[in-house]
């Protein structure tokens, strides 16, 4: 689980670093693809992690008011907000085909 969380975090840090480097060098850097990769990976990995947590907790994991149940609802909405996973895949695919 920790590796999945770290993978999303590292891609997010990479996209932010590229953006900062572009500002520091005063050259516009497009980080759309990196941001899409980070968002897609982070949200999909978060969904996998929360699914594993639900599996570990069994029936108590879906009980209203528990932390796992709350996280499951939160993660599900994050996968849709700011572009669903399929939209992120289209952005990434378009960039790969253009390069």
Q: For the regions a protein language model found, what residue spans apply to each?
A:
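Alpha-helical interface subdomain recognition
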Residues: 1-99
